[in-house]
């Protein structure tokens, strides 16, 4: 069973060296840092370090202006060539994308300054493809070449806790879904009066570490199969989900690529 391996602190690019081999890029990304207060300095530095590391690997990173965290738009032209190191995939995989992406704040009732969604943690698994579609980066997995899992910070979360941007809805019955979420995803809540819908409140699950074994796009929906590679914990600060570690699962479903529509979202990495 494949397992997820932490690459350590986001500012440490030493662990990224093996991932840089075979990756080429023509991306030009400008990251601006203006005056900032001490409260935001550390988070911004983590983002800056991580963004630079991603840039070296050919991953699209939006321009960021810290002055008020206003939305900035940048046009990037990126060529990525990933040469397989495995016998099962001899040809290189290249993807050229020209995209307009921006990072900004959503409407919020909070009066406090919120950071945009920023990448704060890198995890190493295995994959053969990174794709950009409808403002999202999607991943296809195999055992051929290295890849990255991305942690993102939800701008609506004031704690700065890293979570997956994911909402999972599986359409095969409430009870089966309930068991799936509790037993395989390690997410459980008892504060809903309707016990049959205990785990289906409108919030994203935060269980990390999946190995994607298949990926396709049909009518703007992502169709995929996945294997759970191991739980890292609900919020990265406790081991409350240790019992779910290395519980294998495989499943296929569709996930809508429009999270703003209130439907399923699958691992949205960078909002465009």
From Swiss-Prot:
InterPro entries: MgpC. This is Putative MgpC-like protein MPN_102. It holds the Pfam family MgpC. It comes from Mycoplasma pneumoniae (strain ATCC 29342 / M129 / Subtype 1) (Mycoplasmoides pneumoniae). Belongs to the MgpC family.
């Amino acid at each position: 069973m494949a397992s997820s391996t932490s690459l350590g602190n986001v500012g440490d690019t030493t662990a990224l060296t093996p991932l840089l081999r075979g990756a080429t890029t023509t991306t030009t990304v400008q990251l601006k840092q203006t005056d900032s207060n001490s409260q935001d300095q550390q988070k911004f530095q983590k983002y800056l370090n991580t963004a630079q590391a991603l840039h070296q690997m050919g991953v699209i990173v939006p321009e960021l202006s810290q002055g008020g965290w206003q939305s900035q738009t940048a046009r990037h032209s990126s060529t990525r060539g990933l040469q397989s190191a495995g016998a099962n995939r001899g040809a290189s995989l290249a993807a050229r994308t020209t995209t307009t992406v921006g990072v900004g704040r959503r409407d919020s009732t909070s009066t406090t300054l919120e950071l945009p969604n920023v990448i704060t943690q890198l995890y190493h698994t295995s994959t053969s493809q990174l794709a950009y579609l409808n403002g999202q980066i999607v991943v296809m997995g195999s055992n051929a070449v290295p890849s990255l899992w991305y942690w993102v910070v939800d701008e609506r979360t004031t704690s700065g806790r890293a979570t997956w941007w994911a909402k999972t809805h599986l359409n095969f019955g409430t009870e089966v879904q309930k068991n799936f979420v509790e037993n395989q995803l390690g997410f459980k809540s008892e504060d809903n009066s309707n016990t049959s819908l205990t785990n289906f409140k409108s919030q994203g699950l935060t269980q990390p570490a999946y190995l994607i074994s298949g990926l396709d796009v049909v009518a703007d929906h992502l169709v995929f199969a996945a294997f759970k590679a191991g739980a890292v914990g609900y919020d990265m600060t406790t081991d409350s989900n240790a019992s779910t570690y290395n519980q294998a699962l495989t499943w296929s479903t569709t996930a809508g690529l429009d999270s703003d529509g209130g439907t399923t979202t699958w691992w949205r990495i960078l909002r465009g």
